[in-house]
Amino acid sequence: CWSRDGKFLAFEIKRGANQHVTVMPAAGGPTTQLTTERGLSWPYSWSPDDDKIAFAGYRNDLWNIYWISRSTKEQKQLTNYNKLNAFVRYPEWDPSGKRIIYEYSESVGNIWLMDLK
């Protein structure tokens, strides 16, 4: 996904059985892997300040929503789902940066809006 200012791209890169959030300058150049945890990390959208990337992460057999900072690599888990057959995807920041909307489903898709504190 493109950063809002168009200067960076975020994408997942496969390393063995794992997929990690990775960024690179849109004009080309070296890539920077941001996540290191085992599992899947699927980046989807940038925060309004173009520093954080919201992504769906599959870790320890569970899907949750996270963000990670491009500049510091600080990471935060935003949801705490614990059902094995559920999934989350498509996290998108609102223009103010105060909320994230995403899909959560145990069997049929539902749209959730989360306030960030």
Residue ranges and their predicted role:
Residues 17-22, 61-66, 108-114:
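Structural motif
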